[in-house]
Amino acid sequence: MNNQDRVQKPSKPAANSLKQAEKKKREVFKAVLASPYSRRNLWPAVSVELQNNLVDLLCSILEEIGTFNRLSQAEKNSSGLEKPSISEYVIYGFNSCMKALEEQSKKIQSMKLVLNSDHILRYLFVCKLDMTTPLLFQHFPILSAYANVKLIQLPKNTHQKLQKVLGLKKPIEVLVLAKGAAKMYPLLAELAEGVEDVDIEFLRSGPFEAKIKHILTQQTVKK
């Protein structure tokens, strides 16, 4: 067979090919300029030194909880040990922290929050760099603003340190401390209060309503 008899494959799929047919477009709205409603990743700056100091202090505070968690149920029953007092003011785990923050946010909005309670959430620690996708952490600035808590980013690999000190089977990427913990450990409060509050412009009350313009465009959808 000579070169002229060979069948050459098209370099690109034809316009009516199955591959092209699989590509569809859908209509979407996109902001003309940056929208304040989409600026979710506004994290307060925390120096490396402060982050490391906070991690060391947190590990020291949580060690008592870890000792209790490592005991079997039989050991807890036979020894008569109760949870450490600090446990009352510590919440860890993504789902548990989210639920607590959302509940506090609702209480603030409805003006039902007991201001002098030691159980008011005060500090939200997030291992942002240890999370696998931004979807897991990009909402925390807005949520922390609504819940009126300090948002503090911790260094990479802190999730494993928290897992170890708490005696758990899975890494801990989110940790919340209540006001009572700050009373028990004044140094913790002093360090954490050094972090600025989340500042999100559109959450502030203003004389004019924010108007965000959008355009209708198309986005390719692949099957």
Regions found by a protein language model. Give the residues of each.
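Extracellular/luminal Protease-associated
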Residues: K106-H159
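Generic structural motif recognizing short loop/turn segments at the entrances and edges of beta-strands
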Residues: I86-E88, R122, K170-E173
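Short acidic, S/G/P-rich loop/turn micro-motifs used as interaction or catalytic elements
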Residues: C97, L129-T133, A181-K183
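Sequence-level detector for tyrosine residue identity
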Residues: Y37, Y89-Y92, Y123, F140, ...
